[in-house]
UniProtKB/Swiss-Prot annotation:
Keywords carried by this UniProt record: Signal
Keyword Signal found: yes
Name of the protein in question: Uncharacterized protein HI_0149
Top-level lineage group: Bacteria
The organism's taxonomic lineage, starting at the top: Bacteria, Pseudomonadati, Pseudomonadota, Gammaproteobacteria, Pasteurellales
Species of provenance: Haemophilus influenzae (strain ATCC 51907 / DSM 11121 / KW20 / Rd)
Leader peptide range in chain numbering: 1-21
Amino acid sequence: MYLSLLLILLAWTLWLGNSLAWLGVIIFILVINQFQIAREETYLESKFGDEYRRYKQKVRRWL
């Protein structure tokens, strides 16, 4: 899901043709990694334990 949102944001940034819009892409990546995905991973590790940790080793974060 996050990858699709990033692709939409990238397409919009290219369509705008504004170099300042790239700042939005960078901020999106930083915020999603730090605040959304990290919290989800912490929750999933507490809920599923080793099973989720093994899954994380096989699957990339941004899928």
